[in-house]
Regions:
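Membrane-embedded transmembrane alpha-helical bundles that form the catalytic cores
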Residues: 1-461
Length: 462
């Protein structure tokens, strides 16, 4: 059940919130966990047992890692938990990639959210082992942490200690509901009115690589970069908004990544919660940047190899991860020179656009079906095809408005203008205008969805 589906927007969500707000506080966790499991089972009924098994094993191992247990026992339990969670992930996501050349394996449909709830479980077990957080004795609360429906399928990935207080007790006021509803609607509009509108351009171009021209290749790449941003950041906005309406505060997951000042800065702005997870639970345990230059570069490459594999079991994702790993390593090596000789003049003016170009070019590996298709696409981008065709010019004619709107929407311009306007208005007027905007965006998004323009979220496949 996708957040942007009619069944979620007009059936599940209203009914769930009516029940949730009417019941007493002591029953909210029970209803929320039941609603979360129903939400998951609606789309993945055969994989609900896998989620429940992950919850139960994580809870049992966390309980067994009590502080008074010996260090060796706790370490052994942590290893057991990591083997279980990573083994689960390998079995359903990577078995064909790692072992398909040796044995004939059935092709499994990837369970929704498995990459996300597995990482949540690992972070909990590691934090309990480090005694950063006490073991959760209440199975219901731990189950809710792993299965909480706003973040279950596509994140954000939130460390357990950040949600622990709200799992035990939370309050919800009118401001939470208002702000959460507004944030959810902004995310819905990003998804329905921008990401799904760009899907026609992206699908048309990427689905017919034989007809690629230089113009269509660039249109397809720019369109995909914007589609992916609005698709995933829109989901994150909806998740953050839903969490707020339920009494939870989720961290931001995007911060205008296409305004990056470097490749490293791009990844401090894109899928922030995933980058934070890899930094805390892989990069730092490997030694981070405290182990000398060569080991630091090794650590960075290992993290980016893991990041690529996390996204998917194919050589495209492996190379995509290594592509960004190499770029970040180069930045690490060249940083002392840049500090000694600050960028000035033409170099300073070119650095940002070059970094943006390199970041966007990485999406070719991310989107292409396989490596030969990626190679073909790269060749067409840089002159390995006719400059344009009638079809390419038609794409430009039909989609330039949404491309322009997307380019503006990928900057903080609209948010800044709205903030300045809101600061000049009385609170009552501001609230009324916000309500009108919510209703207008909801109506426009609903019309678009009812016209049959619904597209699945891109990150559902991860």
């Amino acid at each position: 059940m996708a957040f942007s589906s009619i069944s979620f927007l007009f059936y599940f969500l209203p009914l769930f919130f009516i029940i949730y707000y009417l019941i007493p506080a002591r029953a909210k966790n029970v209803v929320l966990l039941a609603g979360s499991l129903f939400f998951y089972a609606w789309g993945e009924p055969r994989w609900i047992l896998l989620l429940l098994a992950s919850i139960l094993v994580t809870w049992l191992l966390g309980r067994a890692m009590r502080p008074e247990a010996s260090a060796g026992r706790r370490r052994g339990l942590l290893i057991l938990g990591l083997v279980f969670q990573l083994g689960l992930l390998v079995a359903v996501k990577y078995a064909g990639f790692f072992f398909g050349a040796f044995i004939d394996l059935p092709k499994l449909h990837l369970p929704l959210g498995v990459s996300f709830y597995t990482f949540h479980a690992i972070s909990y077990l590691v934090d309990v082992y480090r005694q950063k957080t006490p073991p959760q004795k209440n199975l219901l609360r731990l189950g809710l942490y792993l299965a909480l429906f706003p973040k279950l399928v596509m994140g954000p990935i939130v460390p357990y200690h950040e949600l622990e207080p709200a799992l035990a007790q939370r309050t919800i006021d009118a401001q939470d509901v208002s702000d959460g509803c507004f944030r959810f609607t902004i995310g819905l509009a990003k998804k329905a009115l921008l990401a799904d509108a760009l899907a026609g351009l992206v699908t048309g171009i990427w689905g017919d690589l034989a007809s690629l021209t230089v113009l269509s290749a660039w249109l397809g790449l720019i369109g995909y970069a914007l589609q992916l941003y609005f698709d995933f950041s829109g989901y994150s906005d909806m998740a953050i908004g839903l969490g707020r309406m339920l009494g939870f505060r989720f961290p931001e997951n995007f911060r205008y990544p296409y305004l990056c000042s470097s490749i490293s800065d791009f990844w401090r702005r894109w899928h922030i919660s995933l980058g934070s997870w890899f930094k805390e639970y892989l990069y730092f345990p490997l030694g981070g940047s405290r182990t000398g230059t060569l080991r630091t570069l090794r650590n960075l490459l290992l993290v980016w190899l893991a990041t690529g594999l996390w996204h998917g079991a194919s050589w495209n994702y492996v190379l995509w991860g290594l592509y960004f790993g190499v770029l970040i390593c180069l930045e690490k090596l060249l940083a002392p020179r840049f500090r000694a000789h600050p960028r000035k003049g033409l170099l300073a003016g070119l650095y940002r656009p070059v970094c943006l170009l390199l970041a966007v070019l990485g999406w070719v590996l991310f989107r292409a079906e396989d490596l030969p298709a990626a190679g073909r696409y790269f060749a067409c981008l840089f002159g390995g095809a006719a400059v344009a065709s009638a079809q390419a010019r038609l794409y430009l004619h039909d989609f330039w408005p949404v491309l322009l709107l997307g380019a503006v929407g990928a900057t903080p311009l609209c948010a800044k203008l709205a903030g300045r306007l809101g600061a000049k208005l009385q609170p009552g007027v501001r609230a009324a205008l916000q309500a009108v905007l919510v209703l207008a965006l909801l109506a426009c998004s609903t019309v678009w969805l009812l016209n049959g323009s619904f597209q699945s979220f891109v990150y559902f496949q991860f």
